[in-house]
Amino acid sequence: MSLNKTIYEGKAKAIIETEDSSTVIQHFKDDVTAFNKEKYEIIESKGIINNHISAFIMEKLEKAEISTHFIKTLNEREQLVKKLKIIPLEVVVRNVAAGSFCKRFNIKEGERLASPIIDFFYKNDDLADPMVSENHILYFDWLSSKEMDEVKTTTLKINEILVHLFSNASIYLVDLKLEFGRLINDSTKIVLADEISPDNCRLWDKNTYKKLDKDVFRLNLGDLKEAYLEVAKRLSVKLG
C-alpha cells in the first residue's frame, strides 16, 4: 500500500491521499465480508482481480460517455481516481429476482424482471444500510429532484451497457450496486464512484446458472477466487 496517508478505509478498499488535492488512490484489499461484517475472510489476490476487472469496466463506461471517477491503473492493487464527496446512497439495479428482493416480495430466485428495477439504500453500516424511498432522499437532501433523475438515467444506461458486456461473456448480470459522488472541485458534477466487480454485481453463468460473484462466499458455494478469475477470463481482462 502507498506510504501516503489513508483518509478512509472500508471493508474492501482504502482511499489514500495524493499530492494533488483533486485526486486520490483507491487501494483494493483482499478482505471479503458478508452480512454486515458478520462473515469475514481474507482471500489472497481478490483485490488484484477486482482492481483489474473494475478498471476494465470503468474504461468501457468512459468510452460510452459515462462519467466516472476512474483516471488510470497505477499497479496491481491501486487506481488513481478523482476525489469525490460520496453521496451516501447505494443504488441497486435489478434485472433478475435474487437476494433480499426475493425475501422482501416472496419471489422465487431467478425470475426475470420485465424491466430493470432500481432500489435505493442509505449507506450506513450502523443501520445495516436501510432501504429508502425517493422522498427520503429529497428530505435528507442527498440529491435534488433533478439529480435523482440524472442518477436513475445514468444507472439504467450503465446497466444496459453491462448487461450486453456480460452477455457476450456468457454471463447474466442479475443485479449490481452502484455508488455516485460529487467532484471535490465541482459539486454540481455527479460521477460514478467506487468499483464494478464481482464484489458488487450478481453474476450467473448463462448455461448452468452457477454463481460467479460474492454469493459464492456468502452462501459457501465454493472457491471465491476461482469464480472471480473465471469472470476476468471471460471478459478477457489481463491480470498483469
From Swiss-Prot:
Superkingdom of this protein's organism: Bacteria
Enzyme Commission no: 6.3.2.6
Reaction catalysis annotation: 5-amino-1-(5-phospho-D-ribosyl)imidazole-4-carboxylate + L-aspartate + ATP = (2S)-2-[5-amino-1-(5-phospho-beta-D-ribosyl)imidazole-4-carboxamido]succinate + ADP + phosphate + 2 H(+)
Keywords per UniProt: ATP-binding, Ligase, Nucleotide-binding, Purine biosynthesis
Family: Belongs to the SAICAR synthetase family.
Species classification: Bacteria, Pseudomonadati, Pseudomonadota, Alphaproteobacteria, Rickettsiales
Any one biological process term the GO annotation gives: cobalamin biosynthetic process
Gene name in the database record: purC
Protein name: Phosphoribosylaminoimidazole-succinocarboxamide synthase
